[in-house]
Amino acid sequence: MALGASAVQMGSIFVPTEECDASVEFKKVYLNAHREDIRIIQSPVGMPGRAFDGEFIRNVAEGKEKPRSCPFHCIKTCDYTKSPYCIIKALYNAARGNMKKGYAFAGGNAYLSDRIRSVKEVIEKLKADFFLSKALL
């Protein structure tokens, strides 16, 4: 905040927690990731997003995940005939642990988690890091 920020996004740090209801397989993507595993992808409506690279993302790049129909109609601007994949199916599959048919969005530091923690542990670490950084300023 001292550098002029008015807010931060910190969702990724809470994914590999005991309280997160995502599957263990989904959480393992965060725990096993390296910095180079995170890349910018394009959503079916052309919006960029940061995600972990994986089999599904590579299949999308090769044109292997094109939808044949659209049972959901979740995004008005999404044209399934031009879309490289169905985002709702990909995110649903990933949340359920089927990472071969889905992917996980990620923050820039999402690869830093090394184990599943409780939210309480995450908050305590954030507080400790904050006070340490404040002392160094």
Where are each of the predicted segments found?
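Conserved active-site-proximal phosphate/metal-binding subdomains
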Residues: 1-137
